Amino acid sequence: MGLAFAGMLMASCTDSPTAVADYQVVPMPLEITAASQGSFLLKSGETICYTAGNEKMKKNAEFLAAFIKEQTGIALKVAEGDGEEGIVLRLGLEADSPEAYRLKVDERKVEISAPSEAGVFYGIQTLRKSVSVHEGAGAVELPAVEINDSPRFSYRGMMLDVGRHMFSMDEIKTYIDMLALHNINRFHWHLSEDQGWRIEIKKYPKLTEIGSKRSETVIGRNSGQYDGKPYGGFYTQEQAREIVAYAAERYITVIPEIDLPGHMQAALAAYPELGCTGGPYEVWRMWGISDNVLCAGNDKTIQFIKDVLAEIIDIFPSEYIHVGGDECPKVKWETCPKCQARIKALGIKGDSKHSKEEYLQSYVIQEAEKFLTENGRSMIGWDEILEGGLAPNATVMSWRGEAGGIEAARQQHNVIMTPNTYLYFDYYQAKDTDSEPLAIGGYLPMERVYSYEPMPSALSPEEQKFITGVQANLWTEYIPTMAQAQYMVLPRMAALCETQWSAPEKKQDYQGFLKRTARLTRIYQLKGWNYATHIFDVNVNIAPNTETGKLDVTASTIDDAPVYYTLDGTEPTTASSKYENGLTIDAACVLRMMAVRPEGNSRITRDSIAFSKSTAKPITMLQPINKPYEFKGATTLVDGMTGDRNYKTGRWIAFYKNDMEAVIDLKEATEISSMTLRTCVEKGDWTFDTRGITVEVSDDNKTFKKVASEAYPAMKETDANQIYTHTLTFDPVKTRYVKVTALSEQNIPAWHGGKGNPGFLFVDEIVLN
């Protein structure tokens, strides 16, 4: 994607010899107190003074000088001392958090003080972002101010998966620089996968000799076609130590992850004796989760885990070591004599909560946790480690929503919140997925990331104390380059960091946040980072007006840029209709909108709208919509718009454990003879087609008469994942109220991994004609 839009927000003062700083930064500081008058003039030749003999403070001073030079061209000197003029970095501030800082500006000096070197670094980041980018400025005026700031959470993380796709040393360092700009202090490095082992383990050299290389990679979403190109690579232990040191200079701790006992097919390709069948295995060429996992009944497995973790501990000084624990299929264990013997020897029995194989996984995780504890480290695992019993000192990373985190906090275990529906940055960030790079699915726009509140209201104040951090994740099945990785995380990382750092009361103004983020993108552009530009597009909202029977359209932009639109599907220009204060649609059309700016126009939005007799009519749901997929609620079914294969964009709503049952009020007796609805099927996600549809009519909304019904068989494994269109026709009938019932799958078939459970039913529109 192009970067043209960031330039449009460059302040006019960039052409002037003196620029003016602006303290409206991301993340928003806790307290900003502006003085009534006065300012400090930042110009070449000024000196940054730092605490004598403190190498970390010296490095901080050098960072600040480099940032200012890069962003403005102003050259600053660095010297030991505790001056009363110029720029002063000092320790000694008393604060509850070691990462707190105070930034104070007056006519004589700029002072950043903190309890620790890390706090000084965050003060430097705030100053850097306040100065922003003014290349060629002769000076920068810093208005007098006092900023007092500290982070909400002590753990502020961002993950990068290098198992599916690997990145060079320079690219990893760039990623760390991105984290530092956003006040993130934990780099979670996902180093092992079915598709590749990425870290040198000297006791097991085949892990990298064999396990780091796959013969080829599947094209797209497990299409069955492969690219025929060998893919591989790994980091030596010395390279990993270099990354640890680079991150530490920026006050970022690297947390390594070795995912076990699942996600281990690459390791099994190297050491097949560690698997239940003994192989042969290959480094996996496709995406998803392999059934081939470490054999929990093999004595060598526990020793392998301990040996690997011993070398990981030696490389990484982090307080936490991540052992994964997620998505471990148990099918091999169920038929493995060694695993079943281990279950018997341990006296494990299944119960109504967990199978005996799930309890066996808990045994493996607890062995890993015991080893880490004995070696002075703490363990993190994904929320699946709750299944079968939580290891005594484990920290839970809650990714499947918040339920795991809530359960762990109630058990008085530390929790890091990373729910996929808010913080998985491999999800699409735009509804128009055809114009986006291929992604894993989902829909996670900037606003949803920003809306996340990590403290569950279900927890008491005492229990909430165990929520110690927030993290976002970038899984890389469909992200082969750092440029694409940057596109997926920027600027969503800005929304993440404000959630991690800023107090909740500072997160009430999303539009203000967007304006601050637009300023931040100047630094992205200067650094050459390939950020997404969706925040500069037209924000279009289309809502049914059940009073008028029409659709009301509102449009806005981040900077009030003029918007032009067309209704016939053609590309808008400045000769097209100009959007003023709302738009009403009462007929089928293709609405396209564009923001016009001197520096470059926005991308063009596109919404296809169809009208039927049910469009913009009052609708009532008789059974509840599934909360995570409620979006705009029942009106989604009468808004004239249909969804695509991505059921998470807000164009679909879902039903789970109950059926879709809707009554549409046509407002007057109206003749109809057909009903069409569509379902979105993605069997791997437990989303299934309807098992039956009934159409009923009524004149009084009390007594209904059935006019059409159709039953559908349970889906077969070979049935396609796609959108299914169901049309029921019937003799013309004049009626006011129409009840449409679509039955959901209540018993997933035996061929599916979710057999016996209910499935999701996704519906996008009810069309009456």
Residue ranges with predicted function:
Residues 2, 27, 508, 514-663, ...:
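Short, compositionally stereotyped local motifs that mark structural "simplifiers"
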